[in-house]
A protein has these predicted regions:
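Amphipathic alpha-helical polymerization modules
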Residues: 1-139
Length: 139
């Protein structure tokens, strides 16, 4: 992939990465209360995997870096078994298996992703304002 052409491209890439993160978290929260008839079928929380991309020579003044989502993986957590013999999804022993989503953890992650998105948006907006003022000075 070619590097960003300007600060707006860099902001777009960073905001896109945070959107992947927020969409994954939203999916986790939506499936938090789900149950299944076996541990294999139970919903497992997911997390995006990010990769840092550098544009220019690392260590040089003016080197740009951003991150991008390269994959979404399931967390390695075992679903909790609950004894609910009257539940329609209960197995032969009367157990259902709950999703591995921790709603509090997901909400903290969502808040962090939202703030990172907002910070990037503010940086891009500030850069746009500075560019506009610079152009206005030349008139």
């Amino acid at each position: 992939m070619s590097g960003p052409n300007n600060i707006f491209d860099l902001g777009k890439m960073a905001m896109s990465a945070q959107m992947v993160r927020m969409n994954t978290l939203a999916s986790n929260i939506a499936n938090a209360g789900s149950v299944a008839s076996s541990p294999e079928e139970a919903y497992r929380a997911m997390r995006p995997v990010f990769e840092t991309e550098y544009f220019g020579h690392i260590g040089d003044l003016g080197t740009l870096a951003t991150s991008r989502a390269v994959d979404v993986v399931q967390l390695d957590r075992e679903p909790e078994s609950k004894f609910l013999p009257d539940h329609p999804l209960a197995d032969a022993d009367g157990f259902v298996y709950a999703s591995t989503v921790n709603v509090e953890e997901e909400m903290v992650e969502m808040l962090e992703a939202s703030r990172e998105y907002q910070n990037t948006l503010e940086a891009v907006s500030t850069m746009r304002t500075l560019m506009s003022r610079t152009v206005a000075m030349g008139k």
